[in-house]
Amino acid sequence: MHLAAGAAALAAVPRTARAQAYPSRLVRIIVPFPAGQASDTVARLVGQSLSERLAQPFVIENRTGAGGNIGTESVVRATPDGHTLLLMGLSNAMNATLYKKLNFNFIREIAPVASIGGAPYVMVVNSSVPAKTVPEFIAYAKANPSKINMGSSGSGSVSHIFGERFKMMTGVNLVHVPYRGGYVPDLLSGQVQVVFGTISSCIQYIRGGMLRALAVTTLTRSDVLPEIPTLAEFVLGYEASQWYGIGAPKDTPAEVIVKLNTEINAVTAHPLIKARLAGLGVDPMSMTSAAFGTFIADEAERWGKVIRTADIKAE
């Protein structure tokens, strides 16, 4: 008994030492999307705080392309020591279904480290659209089938898939118009009439009266737009949320993941960071790495069904 206990204690020493020594050098956080997007801003907020807390630089590296798959694969192939991390989100979980010939399995080859937060999208219409509520919009769309254009940030994008889910649940016929660049200019001009967009991209136009917010996509109202109802108040069961978190290559030491999880949860609980995230429409979401892994798998399955049912193809 004493020998077994002693062996266990000795085995724990390297693991404890490894956690204490981490990070031993610069840490790269790969953001698989362009600089300036909400995911990039979230990564920089968290990275700066981790740099201060752990006394090593956490550097953001934007590695874009293929719907986020290029940056994600670079993390899959990285040395699993905790010094290369991934800023990941809902699109990563969706890509598992959207892309048929990936060179990696996101669910199996990226270890969940820590969740950062979740963010509603907002259903917005051009101010010329006569509908002022979701029920009015549904009635208007059904009276004008195939005459209303729904913009998105690309075929297979989060905004596209959220819109397709709305179409499936309400029976409306909207014409999807994907954009490689921003959809906001054409939404403002009326070339497209409705978009499921990020709050951060739309809020200044909502407050300026150029766009009308009909609903947010989460089950609870947003603190940023508390007067705007949820879609679920009118479309029973509709719930959709963008989310962000940190991942690492599989086989990253468990003690490193635990340390990062603890540190990231502390970062997102800090009042200043919470306020900065709130400005982006992001609500902190804290959970263990294991719980985060279950959450990601559930999201991949849920949105995979929508993608298959609507026969959505990535660009």
Map each language-model feature to its residues:
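N-terminal (or domain-start) structured segment
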Residues: 13, 17-107, 147-149, 170-196, ...
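N-terminal export signals
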Residues: 1-19
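Hinge/capping helix and adjacent helix->loop/strand transition within the periplasmic-binding protein
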Residues: 77-83, 97-182, 231, 236, ...
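An extracytoplasmic/periplasmic, membrane-proximal ligand-sensing/linker region
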Residues: 24-26, 169-170, 254-315
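A ligand-binding cleft/hinge motif common to bilobed small-molecule-binding domains
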Residues: 92-101, 165-169, 194-227
